[in-house]
Every structure is written in structure tokens, then in C-alpha cells.
Amino acid sequence: MIKLLLGLLGLTGALVAAGLLIGGGTLLWVDTAMTDSEGFINSKPVGLKTEAYAITTPPAEVEIEIPGPIDVGTVATLRISAENRDPEKGVFIGLAGAADLGGYLSDVAYDEIVELEAEPFEVTLVTHPGVAAPQTPTAQAFWTASAHGIGPQTFTWDVESGDYAVVLMNEDASSGVEVETVVGTRVPVMRPFGTSLLIAGGIVLVFGTLMIGLAI
């Protein structure tokens, strides 16, 4: 009876260890093979076009609860790059509180991204009608993060809790927006967390192997 219990404990430990080792190995592989030189995992370039004044993401509620005195910026960093396909026009990319951005685009015609399909790649946009022209985005003070100018433009943002949305516009706030954008995310805790899982998996595997050995 004791050997049976030891065998069951050993088998359970081996299964748990396998999960920990696979999880840790996967995180380390992603951190090594899928990140660029700055540690970001990037999307493919995405082309977006509208005849309206802006293209926005839907509002996203971000909630981060970190135990202990850990800087939120170490959890994840968002990086968005964009370039106007008209080489003579500057691009504006901005991240702001959803309420602030909604107020800025009130009564302004813009398109909102409502769905992204990976295979085959497809972006679904919904048009919000309006009759007003927006004020120049670079003159606004509510942006959490932004970048603008001719050629490729990039901003990075250490993720914080709140309700946010992203907007893509022409720098001069004119209608007819056509841009190419890339989104990247960096998760610094991925490597140490993956390493911790591997260590824990190794310890549990030793325990499981010992139990199985005692049961034989």
C-alpha cells in the first residue's frame, strides 16, 4: 500500500514537473527566439487606410496588480511604430486615456479597429461619422505617449493601469490617413519567470523520480 502511494506521488510529481519544464522552456524560447535586439516581440507590419481623419483602437482597460515594491514598468512595455505612406506627410501616433481621446474626436469622422484576423490577415474597421475637423494632435496636452514627424516614428510606454486607446493620424490633422504600423511588447519578467519554472520543475522532477524509485 505504501509503495502504491509512493508511486502515485512520484507519477504526480513527474507530471507536474513536465508542465513546469515545458512552460519554463517555452518562455525562455520565446524570450530568445522571438524578440529583437531590444527585447521586443513585434507584430508584422500592418497597413491601415481611411478617408476619415483618424484610425483608433477600441478602448482597453488595463489592470496591473503587482505584489510588493516592484516597478510597474518592469512588467511590460508597449512600443508602437508608424510611418505615413505619403512621404511628404508626417504621421502622428498617440496613446491617451479613452475618455480624453473620445472627447478629442467628438463629432469628428474616424475609423475604429473592431476586429483583427491573423489567417488570412484582415482588419475590420467601423466608421464613426462626424462633421467637425479635429484640432492639430500635436497641440494637445493629454497624450500619455506620442510621436510624430515625417518618416518612421516610434513611442514606448511602460504599461500602467487605466483605460486607454491609441490613435493614428496625419500630423497636420488632415483627412485621408494611410499608414504602416508595427506593434511590439517587451516583458522583462519573462526570462526570470521562465528560469524559475525550470528550476522548480527540476526540483519536482527529482522528488517524483525519488518517489518512483522508492515504490519499485
Where on the chain are the PLM-derived regions?
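Juxtamembrane interface at the cytosolic side of transmembrane helices
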Residues: 1-8, 190-216
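Extracytoplasmic/periplasmic regions of membrane proteins
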Residues: 33-184
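C-terminal edge strands of extracellular/lumenal beta-sandwich accessory domains
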Residues: 173-196, 203
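Hydrophobic secretory-pathway targeting helix
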Residues: 1-35
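Glycine-centered flexibility sites
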Residues: 10-13, 17, 24, 162, ...
